[in-house]
Amino acid sequence: MGDAATLALGALTAVQTGCAIDLDTDHTGPNAPSVGPLRTTPRVAWVLGSGGPRGFVHVGVLKALSELGLKPDLIVGASVGALVGTLFAGGLRANEIERLALELQPALLLRWQPGSSERFSGAGIASFVNQQLDGQRLQALPIAMVCVVQRLRDGVVQGFNQGDTGLAVQAAAAIEGQFTPVRIRGERFADADLRMPLPVRLARSLGATRVLAVDTSAHEERRPAGADRYATSDTRKRALTRPDAELADVLLHPEFGYWASVSTEYRQRVIAAGYAATMAQAAALKALHAT
């Protein structure tokens, strides 16, 4: 099922609420997602990368960071990193997010409603996020949040930080070829994974001087026999990730195995890997957040 499986939290709501699918609505109202100034200049930013089912690792990272008593000024998230990061920025505790992640029944994925070209609508993701956060707008979340998207017309990467929170996450998680792009003010937006899967440079451009980045890409050196067909994809992802990874002050690249899955066992293992990798860097992380 690939990257689409990572967005199962939103799919769960789509199934439960029976939300309608509107494949090409142009969102033009005053609450449509947009780019605007942050409330304050951030010092510490957490950057949560894209990564398909491996993105469950973010849940474990946030759980560990919470136990360490650490908090960012800004969270910048790509794809599943936008989904998990937004829930946390909106006030959900890490253990609540973990519960949601583990309660997912993968069979529900089979009930997603297909759109054009055998793609799925991400409308359930928007509904889910807005329900969980009581309709808070992005600019009003307790922690400043940026949902990273690419504008399909020209591939420009930008970060929504104002407007409809759920719709911004839907756009950030609209995996090309699998989910219908989100149309906002005449432009089509989608997941930025093919442009900037670990948006550290974007966090820096917003003023962050200290950056923790969570890389969820595969460990190429541990590619097992039989996985050669994924070599090109792995190399592409590594090439896109490297320029940003090198700019992070603390980089977490948890060891979660090569093969990805949406099984409960896999989710538990990946969350645990994120937690362990974070705790292993506790001293460096505390120093990063020190005044």
Regions found by a protein language model. Give the residues of each.
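Patatin-like phospholipase
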Residues: 3-75, 87-291
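Gly/Ala-rich beta-loop-alpha elbow adjacent to hydrolase catalytic centers
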Residues: 77, 81
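Catalytic DNA-binding helix-loop module of base-excision-repair DNA glycosylases/AP lyases
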Residues: 84
